[in-house]
Structure formats: C-alpha cells, structure tokens
C-alpha cells in the first residue's frame, strides 16, 4: 500500500472508533460489545498492509485500535471509564 493512501485508512478507523464509543456512551451497545468489535477487527487486520506502513505512531492503526480497546475497559467496579480522547 502506498503511503499516500494510508491516512485514509487511519481516518476510517478514527471515524469508526468515534462511532463505537458513541454507541457505548449512549448505552446502545455495551463496552464488551464495543471491545469485541475492535478485537475482531484487530485480529482480522493484523497482517493488512495498512497496519504496518507507517513509522509515525499517530498513523499506526494497531496503536489506534489498542487505545480504543483500552478506552472501553470498564473500571474494577464495573462502571464505564469516562470517555477521554487525546488529540495528538
């Protein structure tokens, strides 16, 4: 995959992750369902060229997906962590 195409892949995952987080926040799906969506995606796409075309951390889909999955982890008492999203 050419490097000029990869930012579009990243943008797609950024949009998808925002939608999944919104669904979790609005209690349309559970945090576990959101994690399952991204865990499945990560497993399917682990060998995709877009997952390894950039050395820049902001554009590494694997890092983005790890951050999304960890943001959906419930706290120890079972409540959902506040949804925070850092802009880089």
Curated annotation (Swiss-Prot):
Keywords: Early protein, Host cytoplasm. It is found in: Host cytoplasm. It comes from the Viruses. One of its GO terms (cellular component) is host cell cytoplasm. Its main location: host cell. Induction: Expressed in the early phase of the viral replicative cycle. Expression of early genes is repressed by viral Repc (latency) and favored by viral Ner protein. This is Uncharacterized protein gp15.
